[in-house]
A protein has these predicted regions:
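Short, ordered loop/turn segments at secondary-structure junctions
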Residues: 107-109, 145, 161, 168-173
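Conserved short loop/turn motifs at secondary-structure junctions
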Residues: 105-114, 139-146, 356-361
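Flexible, glycine-rich loop/tail regions that form catalytic "lids" or insertion modules at the edges
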Residues: 1-83, 90, 94, 98-101, ...
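Catalytic cores of alpha/beta
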Residues: 146-160
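Active-site-adjacent beta->alpha loops and helix N-cap segments on the catalytic face
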Residues: 111-124, 172-182
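Conserved, mostly hydrophobic/aromatic
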Residues: 106, 125, 156, 210
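Well-ordered alpha-helical segments embedded in enzymatic catalytic cores
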Residues: 86-90, 121-124
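Alpha-helix-loop-beta-strand connector modules within alpha/beta enzyme cores
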Residues: 114-142, 190-197, 201
């Protein structure tokens, strides 16, 4: 059952170990492999600098190897398959060569190089190392500028990452901190704490209390991805609805790259609002639009059922904007016999049983 992440925080843990894993079946192994312990999985640039030069700090007991997930943008989306195959081969060679920490990085992104989506690269490498029987010999650390939100971290952890450095998010925090009256250290600490709380909440929904149990568990469901694509790069993830595949996913990354580096000179230094969190006229679509909110407010102020019906139509009829799976479906009414309204309990009677804690009560 789910865990209450606040009241039951005592049984939760974000501790992560980076590096080789001990053989759980070898009860006589008195010298298990050394691992790096981190109290939470979000790493700063200073932490990454130590990992990049970990051999010098540990007399060669740990050795790290970078895996660059970028490739020339002029290869287009067609270059992604060969690049992933090359990354997988490099990873296996590195493990067999004695490296026990692999750093998946997109820092080489430039005008001429585009990055493979970091979740795709991480999951592909994680799966390939498992299939080659060497996954427990190495730790996976992600260094990416595309990781920002809690769910980004949760997905990476769920598909094999042991720690993540969101370097662009951290750089953004440091640039914004003085404007908010914060020190850079406080801003970063607040962000790390917030992501940690979010990860605990995500795990708690599935009844998982420790990050070590959540890592690599792949407790997700894919929506809008092709079955063969998911089977190849996200093995074990259910996908009940078809959709786009590898090349379409990479084409979106290429399009974003070209939009970023091909920006109008007059817009230099400015970023489009995007509208991911708050509605914008030229941004991402939202279910809650200004029109819908106005209709709802007017219906309650004027006690107008007609206005409420207009609001309900905007929310319920999703076939026009097709933002959800429900918007792609239709009710099967052929051969159905409607129930007479006289046999249905009136709405006025139903709402009397409504309570604020109804969902908690069950």
């Amino acid at each position: 059952p789910p865990i209450y992440p606040i009241r039951e925080e005592l049984v939760t843990s974000l501790i992560s170990f980076i590096g080789p894993k001990p053989n759980l079946l070898d009860v006589n192994n008195v010298n298990p492999p050394r691992r790096l312990e981190v109290m939470q999985p979000i790493l700063t640039e200073r932490d990454m600098a130590k990992l990049h030069h970990i051999a010098a700090f540990t007399d060669g007991k740990f050795r790290s190897r970078e895996l660059d997930i970028t490739y020339p943008v002029n290869w287009g989306s067609e270059g992604v398959e060969a690049q992933i195959a090359s990354l997988c081969a490099q990873a296996v060679d590195a493990v067999k060569g004695g490296y026990n920490i692999l750093i998946i990085t997109d820092r080489a992104v430039s005008r001429d190089r585009v990055a493979i989506p970091v979740l795709l690269a991480t999951s592909a490498l994680h799966q390939h190392l498992i299939s080659e029987g060497v996954r427990t010999d190495v730790g996976l650390v992600v260094e990416s500028g595309s990781v920002i939100e809690t769910q980004h971290f949760a997905l990476l952890m769920g598909y094999g990452a042991e720690a993540v450095c969101p370097y662009i998010a951290l750089a953004t925090l440091r640039s914004l901190a003085p404007k908010r009256g914060l020190t850079e250290e406080t801003a970063v600490a607040n962000y790390v704490k917030a992501i940690g709380k979010g990860l605990t909440k995500v795990m708690a929904k599935m009844g998982i209390s420790t990050l070590m149990s959540y890592r690599g568990a792949r407790i997700f469901e894919a929506i809008g991805l092709k079955t063969d694509f998911v089977k190849r790069y996200f093995w074990g993830t259910p996908t009940r609805v078809e959709g786009i595949g590898l090349f379409e996913v990479m084409q979106e990354a290429v399009n974003r790259h070209r939009a970023a580096y091909g920006i109008n000179p007059s817009m230099q230094g400015e970023l489009p609002t995007g509208g991911e969190y708050a509605w914008r006229a030229d941004g991402e679509e939202h279910m809650w639009t200004p029109e819908a909110i106005v209709k709802l407010q007017r219906s309650t102020r004027d006690n107008s059922f007609k206005t409420y019906q207009e609001y309900a139509k905007i929310i319920n009829d999703q076939s026009k904007r097709q933002m959800t799976l429900r918007g792609l479906l239709k009710f099967k009414t052929a051969g159905a016999t409607p129930v007479p309204l006289e046999e249905v309990e009136p709405a006025a009677q139903i709402v009397r049983r409504f309570a604020a804690g109804a969902m908690s009560i069950g």
